[in-house]
């Protein structure tokens, strides 16, 4: 659904799954990394004449359609759903690209049952670098999750490992997280694992309910975690309601 896999090029723009592109993942076992709905996979920098050629521009990964997962799917590698970007990096060393713009999800995502290794839903950027702008999960991008992950669940406006600067990481949708998370839950305008970035704006404007059993940490709602050096401007805010339900368990930090 409008996704691009492994990229060896200086630019990639306009990976889009349109509003008519509804996706259903039913009874299936997938052993490879999978991308559903306006996603971009690995985009490593390449070497020409012994010199590293950086990806100059990664822009416009967008999902506008509803995506549903049934109860019998088992996905044994990373699974990206709804306007997500994986890695942008120089192979084996640093993660960077000159510019990464506009990672968007507008589509409602429902994951009910099933088992996932590592799951990213709704406007999530992986390991990036350079100048990163606009990683959004919009109001129509509601998320309902009631399944199991063996590792992390990232959802609704998350960016990781920003090397230079970032702006506007945000969630506007209402979200419910149930089930079991095998490691960490990150979501809703969250930025994490940052290295040497200079500025960022992070926000959550949706109502979030968590009833899940989370093995380690729970990082949700307009926040920065594990920041690096040279941080000279940060704006973190939350206007949505957050509910940690009676059934929720968090193994470490919230």
Language model features with spans:
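Surface-exposed loop/turn motifs in large extracellular/passenger domains
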Residues: 1-254
């Amino acid at each position: 659904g409008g996704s691009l896999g492994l990229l060896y090029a200086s630019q990639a723009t306009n990976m889009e799954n349109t509003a008519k592109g509804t996706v259903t993942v039913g009874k299936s076992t997938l052993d490879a990394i999978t991308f559903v709905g306006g996603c971009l996979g690995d985009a490593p920098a390449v070497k020409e004449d012994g010199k590293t050629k950086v990806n100059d521009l990664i822009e416009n990964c967008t999902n506008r359609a509803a995506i549903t997962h049934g109860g019998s799917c088992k996905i044994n590698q990373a699974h990206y759903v709804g306007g997500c970007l994986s890695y942008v990096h120089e192979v084996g060393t640093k993660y960077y690209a000159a510019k990464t713009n506009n990672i968007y999800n507008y589509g409602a995502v429902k994951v009910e049952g099933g088992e996932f290794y590592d799951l990213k839903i709704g406007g999530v950027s992986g390991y990036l670098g350079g100048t990163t702008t606009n990683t959004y999960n919009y109001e129509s991008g509601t998320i309902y999750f009631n399944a199991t992950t063996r590792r992390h669940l990232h959802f609704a406006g998350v960016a990781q490992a920003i090397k230079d600067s970032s702006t506007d990481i945000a969630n506007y949708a209402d979200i419910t997280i149930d089930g079991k998370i095998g490691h960490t839950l990150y979501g809703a305008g969250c930025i994490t694992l940052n290295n040497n970035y200079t500025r960022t704006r992070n926000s959550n404007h949706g109502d979030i309910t968590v009833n899940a059993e989370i093995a380690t940490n729970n990082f949700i709602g307009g926040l920065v975690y594990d920041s690096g050096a040279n941080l000279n401007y940060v704006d973190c805010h939350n206007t949505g309601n957050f509910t940690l339900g009676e059934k929720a368990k968090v193994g470490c930090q919230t």
